[in-house]
Amino acid sequence: MGKYFGTDGVRGEANVELTPELAFKLGRFGGYVLSQHETDVPRVFVARDTRISGQMLEAALIAGLLSVGIHVYKLGVLATPGVAHLVKTEKASAGVMISASHNPAQDNGIKFFAGDGFKLDDALEAEIEALLDAEEDTLPRPSAQGLGDVVEYPEGLRKYQQFLVSTGTDLDGMKVALDTANGAAATSARQIFVDLGADLTVMAEKPDGLNINEGVGSTHPEKLQELVKETGSQIGLAFDGDSDRLIAVDENGVLVDGDRIMYIVGKYLADRGLLAKNTIVTTVMSNLGFHKALDREGIEKAVTAVGDRYVVEEMRKEGYNVGGEQSGHVILMDYNTTGDGQLTAVQLTKIMKETGKKLSELAAEVTIYPQKLVNIRVENSMKDKAMEVPAIAAIIEKMEAEMAGNGRILVRPSGTEPLLRVMAEAPTDAEVDYYVDTIADVVRAEIGS
């Protein structure tokens, strides 16, 4: 991560941290860096989610792009994975998404995609950051025919919808409930499932600029759980603000998280010989029950640090085609280059239809172990050295010995705060409490601040 770019682009409170001035510079300097790697005049797709600050940042960003001769195609409100898909299939130079994903409305972000549909690599982000930190803007200032222009491109939305529909199957007779989080999926999800023939109920589909993710969506699925039960739906599908995540709800109103979704999709592909290298890529936060279910099926797993960026890196490096996170980022590399909530939803309903199984039946193959996570404030200088403290290392070893393989402990530092995260999984809540509390007490005594 750099000074401005985190693991998912540049983020901050809109008009306070992520200002129009910064958006202009990101457009100008980002556009210039991209143009240095192009032989033709660059063509960049720009989209946003439904936040009230989106249009302000979009205008500033586009002005910056135009100032260095970039041709801009405005996609309007579109899901983040829609930008990635269109950049790759329409052979654009790059794409930019204005969104803060599952964050509240006051936040926003700017994320770049390269021409291959993947997020910019660290080297290109470093070039942009160097220009942002330069004392003077010495970039060329073209005029007249050297400036870029803007093309409204609303057909991009329909092309993305048609692509998603093409990956699915006829859902005639299936009752589906959608929660579009008052976000980007509000422009696309309904039509996708109408085209597939589902019997639909849709909630959180009226964005007003301020209600994105507010008590709805993948991070707040409680209302969808009730809606599924009230309507007798066979599945509920909850997206986040930019629709790169999916959390599902079974016909009984029970949540089906990213771990279970990855398992369902991965097993479906493995049974048909279509799971690349018979492996699913996941992070250290995936539940022990997920790991045990994969072991039972003979499916391999590759484990990365937390963050879909690291999952994608591992998938690209090794040629895997399924990966994701417990939070609902699921990457299906046969179809798209990034997590895509609506794509995952289409695949999940297809699997239900083709197997003839209820979602509860498919999900029941993964027994989710109770999990507890405690954040402990520690001295910042010690958070990366906790495992070097003899008492901490000893208590973790003791707890793991007591688990005897029927549980899991993960102790890791926060990437952004002076915190040590202590997580445990075990067959019962009482056991989880015991393991986490015992370790946490020792951590506080040894390095707590």
From Swiss-Prot:
InterPro entries: A-D-PHexomutase_a/b/a-I (IPR005844), A-D-PHexomutase_a/b/a-I/II/III (IPR016055), A-D-PHexomutase_a/b/a-II (IPR005845), A-D-PHexomutase_a/b/a-III (IPR005846), A-D-PHexomutase_C (IPR005843), A-D-PHexomutase_C_sf (IPR036900), A-D-PHexomutase_CS (IPR016066), Alpha-D-phosphohexomutase_SF (IPR005841). Catalyzes the conversion of glucosamine-6-phosphate to glucosamine-1-phosphate. Mg(2+) binds at residues 101, 240, 242, 244. Keywords: Isomerase, Magnesium, Metal-binding, Phosphoprotein. It holds the Pfam family PGM_PMM_III. The modification Phosphoserine is found at residue 101. PROSITE patterns: PGM_PMM. Binds 1 Mg(2+) ion per subunit. Transmembrane segments: none annotated. The gene is glmM. One of its GO terms (cellular component) is cytosol. Its cofactor is Mg(2+). The active site is at residue 101. It catalyses: alpha-D-glucosamine 1-phosphate = D-glucosamine 6-phosphate. Coiled coil: none annotated. NCBIfam families: glmM. The keyword DNA damage does not apply. CDD domains: GlmM (cd05802). GO terms for molecular function: magnesium ion binding; phosphoglucosamine mutase activity; phosphomannomutase activity. Gene3D superfamilies: Alpha-D-Glucose-1,6-Bisphosphate, subunit A, domain 3, Alpha-D-phosphohexomutase, C-terminal domain. This is Phosphoglucosamine mutase. Belongs to the phosphohexose mutase family. GO terms for biological process: carbohydrate metabolic process; peptidoglycan biosynthetic process; UDP-N-acetylglucosamine biosynthetic process. It comes from Streptococcus suis (strain 05ZYH33). Activated by phosphorylation. Its EC number is 5.4.2.10.
